[in-house]
């Protein structure tokens, strides 16, 4: 395997010292090393992958030096437009080094949401005219691939290094941003889920939130038909919930969101607000971290999410960080929806981390979809 310090030093020797991106589980060791060894001016954890390409382009325009964009392959969709209309050699001709974690590689077992993306990862690069190398796990071979990448950048090309599982040696994040919040996300999810009505449904975002909701239902002996577990498509749970809420105005629809996911496509909040579904509750479990992929920080706890929600038109927005506050707000929520309508935002600040024995959904995405559709139909 490759030592993270070896890889980053080779990039530094060749003039690459600026990074932007969205953390990925396959890249967690290299992302952790970058977080520990680059200041905030040279490592920007972006809202989404397309935004990271924009940051890299801006860095090049200002310095003449290419930047490195790190991401999971699930984020390829977010970079298609800036690759085609910003960095492409027929447009602005801006070099960028892409570091792409290859989830769902053919022949390697992975979760359902990664299978299709894994199949098309290199094909998308080919279609976009992006040359790439699957990074070797041997340092001497990897060094030669880095040299090839640097030559491409010198020719003002975009070049991708595609990263398989277990490419980088373990590296534990040292500069961990610890919040002093007492409540776990799992406890918060259980508290909200327990307050739901019989006809209510939940759209939960990707990562730990959906996994913890699934386990709550299982522990209570309940079915999963009321929950749409958005195992992929990060950042879009609020819009899935909006689509349901508008089509089913007689049902209360809850979006269980994370801070990283909400920030990824924050403009969606404005659309929710302007459509103003009276049956829509947007719950953001905010721990200030990309918890599912290594714990790298988000700006979640550094911004005022309720103020953002109110500014775009949410009828109410409340922040809380204790079970007592939650139970108080949840007890009056129905009357608030009846009086002022929706959407309403509930920001619940929670501590980082999850149970080590946390499982994954045992139903398939298709089974989950069909059960929810039957529930909504009845």
Predicted regions and their residues:
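Thiamine diphosphate
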Residues: 1-126, 130-242, 246-251, 299, ...
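DG-centered beta-turn motif at the end of beta-strands
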Residues: 71-74, 251-262, 267-269
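A short alpha/beta connector and helix-capping loop motif
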Residues: 84, 93-96, 266-286
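Active-site regions of oxyanion-processing enzymes, predominantly non-cytosolic
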Residues: 157-162, 341-348
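Residue-level marker for buried hydrophobic side chains located in beta-strands
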Residues: 202, 253-256, 283
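A contiguous pocket-lining binding segment that forms or flanks enzyme active sites
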Residues: 279-313, 319
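Short, basic, low-complexity termini and linkers enriched in Ser/Thr/Gly/Pro
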Residues: 331-341
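Low-complexity intrinsically disordered segments
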Residues: 348-355, 359-361
């Amino acid at each position: 395997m490759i030592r993270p310090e070896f890889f980053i030093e080779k990039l530094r020797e060749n003039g690459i010292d600026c990074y932007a991106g969205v953390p990925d589980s396959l890249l967690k060791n290299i992302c952790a090393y970058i977080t520990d060894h680059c200041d905030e001016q040279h490592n920007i954890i972006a809202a989404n992958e397309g935004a990271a390409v924009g940051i890299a382009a801006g860095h090049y325009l200002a310095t003449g030096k290419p930047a490195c964009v790190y991401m999971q392959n699930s984020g390829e969709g977010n970079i298609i437009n800036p690759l085609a209309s910003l960095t492409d050699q027929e447009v602005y001709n801006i070099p960028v080094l892409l570091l792409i974690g290859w989830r769902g590689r053919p022949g390697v077992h992975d979760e359902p949401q990664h299978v299709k993306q894994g199949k098309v990862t290199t094909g998308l690069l080919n279609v976009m005219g992006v040359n790439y190398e699957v990074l070797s796990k041997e340092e001497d071979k990897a060094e030669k691939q880095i040299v090839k990448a640097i030559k491409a950048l010198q020719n003002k090309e975009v070049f991708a290094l595609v990263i398989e599982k277990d490419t980088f040696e373990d590296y534990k994040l040292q500069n961990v941003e610890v919040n002093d919040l007492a409540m776990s996300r799992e406890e918060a999810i259980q508290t909200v889920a327990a307050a739901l009505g019989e006809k209510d449904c939940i759209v939960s975002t990707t990562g730990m939130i959906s996994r913890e909701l699934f386990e709550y239902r299982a522990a209570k002996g309940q079915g999963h038909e009321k929950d749409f577990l958005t195992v992929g498509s990060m950042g879009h749970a609020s819009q899935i919930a909006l689509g349901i809420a508008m089509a089913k105005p007689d049902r209360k629809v809850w979006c269980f969101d994370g801070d990283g996911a909400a920030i990824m496509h924050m403009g969606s909040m404005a659309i929710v607000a302007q459509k103003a579904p009276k049956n829509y509750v947007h719950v953001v479990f905010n721990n200030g971290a990309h918890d599912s992929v290594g714990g790298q920080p988000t700006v979640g706890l550094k911004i005022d999410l309720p103020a953002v929600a109110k500014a775009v038109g949410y009828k109410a927005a409340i922040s809380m960080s204790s079970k007592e506050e939650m139970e108080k707000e949840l007890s009056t929520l129905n009357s608030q929806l009846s009086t002022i309508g929706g959407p309403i935002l509930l920001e619940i600040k929670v501590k980082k981390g999850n149970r080590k024995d946390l499982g994954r959904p045992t139903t398939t995405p298709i089974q989950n979809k069909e059960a929810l559709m039957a529930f909504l139909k009845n």
